[in-house]
Amino acid sequence: MIKIYSTPTCPWCKKTKEYLKSKNIDFVDVNVADDMKEREEMRSLSKQSGVPVINIDGNIIVGFNKAEIDKLIEK
């Protein structure tokens, strides 16, 4: 499962979601600006407060990193 922790105003979050959509990859989008529980989960997993944070089957990517995303979705 892929989960993206994002905010509505984050341009890198938008790029991440557009990239996954272009590859026909399903994901869950979580708005951490509104959901405090999810924000705390994101911080616990990534040790970061910036977005996007991408959780691909338990592997955490901070920021939009095509190479890392591709490596993990090809597994």
Swiss-Prot record:
Disulfide bonds join 10-13. Pfam families: Glutaredoxin (PF00462). InterPro entries: Arsenate_reductase-like, GLR_AS, GlrX_YruB, Glutaredoxin, Grx-like_ET, Thioredoxin-like_sf. GO terms for biological process: cell redox homeostasis. It comes from the Bacteria. Residues 1-75 form the Glutaredoxin domain. One of its GO terms (molecular function) is electron transfer activity. Keywords: Disulfide bond, Electron transport, Redox-active center, Transport. PROSITE patterns: GLUTAREDOXIN_1, GLUTAREDOXIN_2. Belongs to the glutaredoxin family. NCBIfam families: GlrX_YruB. This is Uncharacterized glutaredoxin-like 8.6 kDa protein in rubredoxin operon. It comes from Clostridium pasteurianum.
